[in-house]
Curated annotation (Swiss-Prot):
Oligomer and partners: The cytochrome bc1 complex contains 11 subunits: 3 respiratory subunits (MT-CYB, CYC1 and UQCRFS1), 2 core proteins (UQCRC1 and UQCRC2) and 6 low-molecular weight proteins (UQCRH/QCR6, UQCRB/QCR7, UQCRQ/QCR8, UQCR10/QCR9, UQCR11/QCR10 and a cleavage product of UQCRFS1). This cytochrome bc1 complex then forms a dimer.
Positions with a binding annotation for heme b b562: H83, H182
Record organism: Petaurista philippensis
Lineage: Eukaryota, Metazoa, Chordata, Craniata, Vertebrata
Keyword DNA-binding assigned: no
The protein, known as: Cytochrome b
Gene transcribed to yield this protein: MT-CYB
């Protein structure tokens, strides 16, 4: 008798995705982040669901409903901080996952990569709208500043911003619709994740060597289920250390002040995981130019398959490209730091230099170095 997991129409899908999936035997811990992102998504949806049971999306009561969750709801403070810091963990895993894809040339799987970039955009939109919901000072002013960027679009900009706001400023209508979108988008993300996995399993996983691994594959279970469980335990441990010891470490103190349209905070800045893009936005004096640079800083990921000039897939055997990759990583850390600093000397010039370096490395230097490596290796 054949095993039910191989014959049952539903269980068969799970079996082919997580149990009998042929997996390259040499994939390293960098391949753990896919499953960790799945775990983060589950944590965020569950905690978000419980928060939504007590939250009210009204400008008069939103801030106090969050206070009520933290003070009066059983373990409400825990659920709220797991959700807030879970978002930070989500983005740490996301950026490491993308970095792994860039380093090992996983972007040569076009469909998987492009769906991944769309996923990144969707998750960023979800996180931005979630940050607005507590209706603190930084929520309100962050929403005002970021949505206002759309007014840079020629001709339709102002009308578009007022349409998104549902009025002439960020108010009740804006908060209500942001809550609605923040609730529905994670389910759209889940659907996109399934499409992402569908395309990945069409080709099979990449591996550190970048070579075809058909001759050396092992079943996903038990080898990589155990490995993923270890990763999940480490992620959960670090999340709970953050939540229970310093839950406000990554937040902004301004968000503990209720939103006040008449009082602007001295430094308006988004959450830490958007600071690199915010720094790129601020480094261009022109409003439309800044918005285009902001969008292109993420959209540029879609160009990697086109810009890939190397005869080798990953960077494992390409020391010059490795150096460039780590310079790019350091540049992103610099941009993140600059995004949190006030707009004054010397931060302005550092931000502008780091922004130029970011685009130059990706668009010009990396393809040229790849071609040089081909010549050096006589390929």
């Amino acid at each position: 008798m054949t095993n039910i997991r191989k014959t049952h129409p539903l269980i068969k899908i799970v079996n082919h995705s997580f149990i009998d999936l042929p997996t390259p035997s040499n994939i390293s811990a960098w391949w753990n982040f896919g499953s960790l992102l799945g775990l983060c998504l589950i944590i965020q949806i569950l905690t978000g669901l419980f928060l939504a049971m007590h939250y009210t999306s009204d400008t008069m009561t939103a801030f106090s409903s969050v206070t009520h969750i933290c003070r009066d709801v059983n373990y409400g403070w825990l659920i709220r901080y797991i959700h807030a810091n879970g978002a930070s963990m989500f983005f740490i895993c996301l950026y490491l996952h993308v970095g792994r894809g860039l380093y090992y040339g996983s972007y040569t799987y076009f469909e998987t990569w492009n769906i991944g970039v769309i996923l990144l955009f969707t998750i960023m939109a979800t996180a931005f709208m979630g940050y607005v919901l507590p209706w603190g000072q930084m929520s309100f002013w962050g929403a005002t500043v970021i949505t206002n960027l759309l007014s840079a679009i020629p001709y339709i900009g102002t009308d578009l911003v007022e349409w998104i706001w549902g009025g002439f400023s960020v108010d009740k209508a804006t908060l209500t619709r942001f809550f609605a979108f923040h609730f529905i988008l994670p389910f759209i993300v889940t659907a996109l994740v399934m499409v992402h996995l569908l395309f990945l399993h069409e080709t099979g996983s990449n591996n550190p060597s970048g070579l075809i691994s058909d001759s050396d594959k092992v079943p996903f279970h038990p080898y990589f289920t155990i490995k993923d469980i270890l990763g999940a335990l480490l992620l959960t441990l670090s999340l709970f250390l953050l939540v229970l010891f310093s839950p406000d470490l990554l937040g902004d103190p301004d968000n503990y002040t209720p939103a006040n349209p008449l009082n602007t905070p001295p430094h308006i800045k988004p959450e830490w995981y958007f600071l690199f893009a915010y720094a790129i936005l601020r480094s261009i004096p022109n409003k439309l130019g800044g918005v285009l640079a902001l969008v292109f800083s993420i959209l540029i990921l879609m160009l990697f398959p086109i810009l890939h000039m190397s005869k080798q897939r990953g960077m494992m055997f390409r020391p010059l490209s490795q150096c460039l990759f780590w310079i790019l990583a350091a540049d992103l850390f610099t941009l993140t730091w600059i995004g949190g600093q006030p707009v004054e000397h010397p931060f302005i010039i550092i931000g502008q230099t780091a922004s130029i370096l970011y685009f130059t490395i990706i668009l010009i230097i990396l393809p040229l170095v790849s071609m040089l490596e081909n010549k050096l290796l006589k390929w």
